[in-house]
């Protein structure tokens, strides 16, 4: 039996990284740092690949420190229609991930591990569960009282100046500029709330400062097959972005090829990956952001398609920063399914929650260990507080408080678990009235499916997409099918004997 039991890593204050003595200047404030940066900008620019590449071996030595000089802004995204029905009752960043976590834990953890401790999360759809999770997982004074760290949700609101809801990524930030500009920082770090990756933002910010950039865009190298699905960028020999193209094809695609050795890739990998795509992750100098959104492009709604291409056109220095690691945009049911199942991959998972040097934090729940009674569990991840009896689980992710009954077979599936346990009294009452308890019933067979929280799957149910349907909407019956993956809705009831 090969079973990985995942425990929730609760957040603990992270000390500021040690800085080399030569880079430590007691008493210098942010204004002094800006004067030093201005002086540097007047010196001849010297290009170094280290300045634009996410190399594990490179050292960071930010002055001023990221905890005092950088504001993290995480964009919660829109209504999440492509992830529906998982977003029916929750915001996209609040969707459960990897048995114990939620999507929002990824960018917040990356921030905390990078010493970015002042964090805002912008959202406007179904934000109740997101607010609850963030308040329980990340308390006040993150990073210690000296740094006055925080993680706060900013919901869309109407005002005399802005009577509309968020119209896009740039508009969301614009509507809260009055709050962001009050922070005495040098840069704004703009992040997405629905990406799965592990990144040291300190290196990203250091590259921004070393290249004297106005804006720095995180870029992912890729081959021709994947490139057609992304917004691509073209750079000059200093790593400066000079052209954008949204999902190009044919000759236009070929024209977007770049020499990725400029950004630090070795020659062999540069031949395999001759394109770079925007990851939707940016560093803006504070004064640049204020000017762009208020003066240059006051009506622009989106960073990727309007603000950043516009900034290059008016002559601003927009740099590319190479991130050569695992990254997944979890924007669709298929991508979400593959990202979750990817953590069970052997011998090396696509994304690991077991990296001690850069932990993923979440809400501490104080649940009991999972109990596995005479079950056959292989190549799977089991969350906390589960009760698994006399069943078979293969290549699956089983979420918090999951209850799986005798004879059940779970294959290539994601079970999100439950928000609470039903008492024995509740179960007895359900049994007497012919009801179905939360969890997976006896002799159920589930294959290539997502079972959302608190679902009640009856006995002898088969969720195996028996007719190989690719797309179907059966909301009144409690499920959808997208890309051939059956998704059972949160709180749904699938009667005993049902075949899907």
UniProtKB/Swiss-Prot annotation:
Expressed in leaves. It is found in: Plastid, Chloroplast; Plastid, Amyloplast. Keywords: Allosteric enzyme, Amyloplast, ATP-binding, Chloroplast, Nucleotide-binding, Nucleotidyltransferase, Plastid, Starch biosynthesis, Transferase, Transit peptide. Induction: Induced by sucrose, glucose and abscisic acid (ABA). Pathway: Glycan biosynthesis; starch biosynthesis. Its main location: plastid. Activated by 3'phosphoglycerate, inhibited by orthophosphate. Allosteric regulation. GO terms for molecular function: ATP binding; glucose-1-phosphate adenylyltransferase activity. Gene3D superfamilies: Hexapeptide repeat proteins (2.160.10.10), Spore Coat Polysaccharide Biosynthesis Protein SpsA, Chain A (3.90.550.10). Its EC number is 2.7.7.27. PROSITE patterns: ADP_GLC_PYROPHOSPH_1, ADP_GLC_PYROPHOSPH_2, ADP_GLC_PYROPHOSPH_3. It catalyses: alpha-D-glucose 1-phosphate + ATP + H(+) = ADP-alpha-D-glucose + diphosphate. GO terms for biological process: glycogen biosynthetic process; starch biosynthetic process. Residues 1-50 form a transit peptide. GO terms for cellular component: amyloplast; chloroplast. It holds the Pfam family LbH_GLGC. Involved in synthesis of starch. Catalyzes the synthesis of ADP-glucose, a molecule that serves as an activated glycosyl donor for alpha-1,4-glucan synthesis. Essential for starch synthesis in leaf chloroplasts and endosperm amyloplasts. NCBIfam families: glgC (TIGR02091), PRK02862.1 (NF002772). Belongs to the bacterial/plant glucose-1-phosphate adenylyltransferase family. Heterotetramer composed of two small and two large subunits. This is Glucose-1-phosphate adenylyltransferase small subunit 1, chloroplastic/amyloplastic. The gene is AGPS1.
